[in-house]
Design a protein with these regions (language model features):
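Bacterial Sec-dependent N-terminal signal peptides
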Residues: 1-29
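Canonical position 11/12 of the leucine-rich repeat
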Residues: 108-111, 131-140, 158-160, 179-187, ...
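Solenoidal tandem-repeat scaffolds enriched in leucines and small polar residues
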Residues: 174-191, 208-218, 225-232, 237-244
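Generic short N-terminal amphipathic or hydrophobic helices
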Residues: 14-17, 200, 211, 267
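N-terminal capping/linker segments that flank leucine-rich repeat
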Residues: 20-131, 142-147, 166-168, 177-181, ...
Length: 389
């Protein structure tokens, strides 16, 4: 009898342990679906609002959604011929559910977009207007659930404040869009070819510990202090069209390789006080004016495509040919302060550089031994003075 009771107790323990183990086992990971998209136009409001993505739009408006597989669309009907085109029902709500790696949403009419739920398979989100100008209605966006997102492009919308603070894995960020072609293959790989679209995004809040590597920006309303460009420690490439902000300093971006900016809004002078940028290979400022242009330790730097002038130039440990070419070919008509450190200039180089200056009452700062009689004479002829470093 005792033996039977002992066996029964042992069996109960085994069964209980097995049951606990099954209960504690993780749920199967979601997989990308390849089934064609389906719709439920009659879904109730509660079901739509419980979706992974919820859009608020005027009733009867059209939203374009890609991909054509892996999604269930609630509150809308699919077009009979264009399988990316959905017409929203009378309640003005559209829900998106499913497991896809890239989601693209196009509409001029979204007033609210919410993605508060975890979507671990979603790596890229593209939200763009159909029109090329920023005529889309002012939009509120909640992306707090996309903690695994790696690529985000938002363009063609008016957004007062865009909160990306939860997106700690984001590597590719596009605020506004224009066709970069072969200049930025990382963005083309992430988003495909997106036509030029104006945007009015006035503030961008980045994750404190962000890992953003590639950043494009084209927005007409973002001013200084509305995006922390000085906290981009992993940044490699930055492209900007028509900036409405002036500070291009990128204080923590010591990994920066390429910097491109063109046509500042309202003729704003840019402050390109870049500091130590040892990996920077290409700086291009076009159709722009710089209040200050300073960079150091960029030993492979190329400046040949920059046509921006500058008032103050400070170069430290960059190629002498690039420094000479920029100052004599672009900055010579506006510059009034030049500082040259750790650059292999000869006396003849300096005299030739000074002779090409077209401004007066400026200051040249170089090593004391370079302020030779010939250099000082050339400076005096231009109304400039020399100062020893």
């Amino acid at each position: 009898m005792k033996k039977s009771l002992a066996l029964l107790a042992l069996a109960s323990l085994f069964i209980g342990t097995t049951s606990c183990r099954k209960k504690d086992e993780p749920k199967p990971a979601p997989v990308v679906s390849t089934d064609p998209n389906t719709t439920d136009a009659s879904a109730d409001v509660a079901a739509i609002k419980n979706s992974q993505a919820v859009l608020t739009v005027p009733a009867g408006s059209v939203v374009y959604i890609e991909p054509q597989t892996g999604l269930k669309i609630l509150g809308a009907t699919m077009d009979a011929t264009d399988k990316t085109k959905y017409t929203v029902g009378t309640n003005g709500l559209l829900g998106i559910n499913g497991n896809v790696e890239k989601l693209k949403i196009q509409s001029d009419d979204i007033t609210n977009l919410s993605l508060p739920k975890s979507s671990p398979l979603l790596k890229a989100l593209i939200l763009v207007s159909k029109s090329s100008s920023a005529t889309a209605t002012a939009t509120a966006i909640d992306l707090s659930g996309l903690t695994d997102l790696e690529s985000l492009l938002i363009a063609g919308y008016s957004i007062e404040s865009l909160d990306l603070t939860k997106l700690n894995k984001l590597k590719n960020l596009g605020i506004g869009a224009w066709n970069l072609g072969a200049n930025f293959p990382e963005m083309t790989d992430a988003f495909g070819t997106i036509p030029e679209k104006a945007s009015r995004i006035s503030e961008v809040k980045l994750p404190a510990n962000n890992v953003i590597e590639n950043f494009i920006m084209r927005t007409a309303t973002l001013q200084d202090g509305k995006c922390d460009f000085d906290n981009l420690p992993k940044l490699k490439k930055f492209f900007c069209q028509s900036p409405f902000f002036s500070n291009f300093t990128f204080a923590k971006s010591t990994e920066l390789e390429v910097l491109y900016a063109t046509a500042p809004t309202a003729g704003i002078k840019l402050n390109a006080d870049l500091g130590n940028k040892p990996k920077l290979k290409d700086i291009t400022f076009r159709t722009a004016s710089l209040s200050k242009f300073a960079v150091s330790n960029a030993t492979e730097l190329v400046l040949k495509d920059s046509n921006a002038d500058a008032i103050a130039v400070e170069f430290d440990n960059i190629p002498a040919k690039q420094a000479y070419g920029y100052i004599t070919g672009r900055a010579n008509k506006t510059v009034t302060s030049i500082t040259l450190k750790n650059i292999a200039f000869s006396e003849a180089n300096l005299v030739n550089l000074i002779n090409k200056l077209e401004t007066r009452n400026g200051t040249l700062k170089v090593k004391g031994e370079l302020l030779t009689t010939a250099v000082n004479a050339a400076l005096a002829a231009k109304g400039w003075t020399g100062a020893a470093l």
